[in-house]
Amino acid sequence: MEEEILRVDGLCKSFVVEKSLTGKISQLLKNEKPEVVNALNNVSFSVKKGEILGILGESGSGKSTLARVLMGIHNADSGSAELLGRKLPGDSRDERMQNLRDMQMVFQDPFGSLDPRMTVRNILLEPIKIHGLKIDGDLEDFLANALEEVGLPKDCLDKYPSQFSGGQRQRIGICRALILNPKLIIADEAVSALDVSVQAQILELLINLKENRGLSMIFISHDVAVVRQIADRIIILYHGNIVEEVDADSLLSGVKHEYSQKLLNAALSLREGK
């Protein structure tokens, strides 16, 4: 039986829609209830060891909210999530730190997610220091090997984020996520800000990391072609609801929900230039 890395059961999250001052006054005068958006509605799924689960949906579908809830940035209204059998985000500080070590995130903006005042060396050392990670052997060799794994040379260590291309910065972000040897990576629109040719290189890197490390991944995107290329299994989100779950090979022929079909048809029309 395949090892289960992550289990999510009945996750729900809602937000009150923020209004302008005028809107708030009007709401009070009319005695109206605040408008609530259900960002996640009874979301359940699991991720196996060495599996890439694609989360596909348009803007506003709840994809990024899901990532933020799993990472502990937002608290769920109800439902539960477990990482390697431990409750997320964790019942104690030690458990929360262990969960953060075992589950890392790669962000959409490779420049905005890196501190421009820090060298690559310090960017990589920061999580090591925060988590008190003990390095066996020479630290310099450890950092050089970490960069090599994501396709970057050792001489990057003393450079700043502004000295790199978008693709190189995303490799640095991936390297930082890997430095703690996590069991699960959440990649939130991790290639959407990159050129198509660079996207392909980063996708290939992520697939290689999965195969070489046995790494599990949640890959979040609005791009049908990208998700189909990288994922083993795909969940389609619509207004916070899972409307479809299919193997990646069955995406083009196996979807049944009306929204899923519209999403695929729109992607095919764009590809054909219609």
Residue spans for each PLM region:
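Conserved ABC transporter NBD signature motif
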Residues: 79-90, 99
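Helix-to-loop junction immediately C-terminal to a conserved catalytic motif
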Residues: 71
